[in-house]
From Swiss-Prot:
Keywords: Cytoplasm, Methyltransferase, rRNA processing, S-adenosyl-L-methionine, Transferase
Main subcellular localisation: cytoplasm
Subcellular location: Cytoplasm
Organism: Proteus mirabilis (strain HI4320)
Enzyme class: transferase
One cellular component term from this protein's GO annotations in UniProt: cytoplasm
EC number(s) on file: 2.1.1.172
CDD domains with a match to the protein in the record: AdoMet_MTases
Catalyzed chemical reaction(s): guanosine(1207) in 16S rRNA + S-adenosyl-L-methionine = N(2)-methylguanosine(1207) in 16S rRNA + S-adenosyl-L-homocysteine + H(+)
Pfam families (UniProt xref): MTS (PF05175), MTS_N (PF08468)
Function: Specifically methylates the guanine in position 1207 of 16S rRNA in the 30S particle.
GO molecular function: 16S rRNA (guanine(1207)-N(2))-methyltransferase activity; nucleic acid binding
Keyword set includes Nucleus: no
Protein name: Ribosomal RNA small subunit methyltransferase C
Length: 337
């Protein structure tokens, strides 16, 4: 088998149990265990576009990407293996959604790294499934139980809203800046003083607040937003709609689904993938930006001040500017010549 996460290695210790089961694997899928596990049938659901793409190649229609798995996709599954994400609210949202579609009696395995907060699974599932801890290894815990109560789930009950700059921001669990605008995005937005026109791409858009603020102030901007997270896609669409703005919102692993070129690429790029720290997405945003910028187009990003993006910007663009700086964040701009 290919390299597996510690949580997946714990699941490997119980492979014999799944041989006669119809398995649904969901949650934070950090590897391709779903395409390698042996069972009567295996399906995989993820809300992360970059996790879905490799599964799609090996599993085809048995891999699902979206905010919530369709009932038709999960109804024949009798076993759920859920990989706990770092965000408890996201786990709650996903498990409530899944347990509304799965049948009573479905076996439930919940696994995750101890530092992720997986030990709160028993409390979270109280009244839905009685879980007990059945294994502990690789600094992970595995819980097991069966579904005793099918939940009621309405995604409209899960929205968080807040106000920023006279705009309404809509966000679902697991989306960055779900309850308030983060300091980095505030600093980035503070650097936009002049009127803007043309085509703008908000990369790693989260709840869509950056594009929404800029679009509201600059009605001649044509907005495109992208993210890997299905919850972010839904949140960005909702944020645009509630503020009466038009924009195209797409799922994309950095630029993988981007087909046009832009006058502006703006981003508050992530530097985490699951529990781990990863700068790959942010570096790819910079390295590949010239391919998606028009001549004279600008990349403007905010990043933690300690991250070494200056050298990458200079290597790719030849030079860069620092438009704003605090002790914690810097806003960089580079122009395609």
């Amino acid at each position: 088998m290919s390299s597996l996460s510690p949580a997946s290695e714990v699941i490997l210790r119980h492979l014999d149990h799944f041989a006669d089961r119809h398995v649904l694997i969901a949650g934070d899928l950090q590897d391709t265990l779903a395409s390698q596990i042996q069972a009567k049938s295996v399906r995989a659901y993820t809300n992360q576009y970059h996790q879905w793409l490799p599964l799609l190649k090996s599993m085809g229609d048995n891999a699902f990407f979206g905010l919530a798995a369709d009932q038709s996709f999960v109804k024949y599954c009798d076993t759920l293996i859920y990989f706990w994400p770092k965000n408890k609210n996201e786990a709650t949202f996903q498990l409530r959604s899944l347990c509304a579609s799965l049948s009573v009696g479905t076996e439930i395995f919940i696994v995750g790294e101890n530092r992720s907060g997986v030990k709160s699974a028993t409390e979270l599932m109280n009244g839905i499934a009685k879980l007990k801890k059945i294994d502990s290894a690789r600094r992970c815990s595995l819980f097991f139980g069966s579904l005793t109560y099918q939940t009621l789930f309405d995604r409209n009950n899960w929205w968080q809203t807040y106000r920023y700059d006279d705009l309404t921001v809509m966000a679902l669990p697991g989306v960055f800046s779900q309850t308030a605008l983060d300091e980095g995005s505030r600093l980035l937005l503070s650097t936009f003083d002049d009127a803007m026109v043309g085509d703008l791409l908000d990369m790693a858009c989260g709840c869509g607040v950056i594009a929404t603020v800029l679009g509201k102030k600059n009605p001649m901007l044509k907005l495109t937003l992208c993210d890997v997270n299905a919850a972010a896609i839904s949140s960005s669409i909702a944020t645009l709609n509630v503020n009466e703005l038009e924009g195209r919102v797409i799922a994309s692993n950095v630029y993988s689904a981007v087909e046009e070129t832009y006058d502006w690429i703006v981003s508050n790029p992530p530097f985490h993938d699951g529990l781990g720290t990863s700068y790959q997405a942010a570096e790819d945003i910079i390295r590949l930006a010239p391919n998606f910028l028009k001549k004279g187009g600008k990349l403007r990003i905010v990043a933690n001040a300690f991250l070494p993006y200056q050298d990458i910007l200079d290597h790719v663009f030849g030079s860069h500017e620092v438009l704003a700086s605090t002790g914690k964040f810097k806003v960089y701009q580079a122009t395609k010549k």
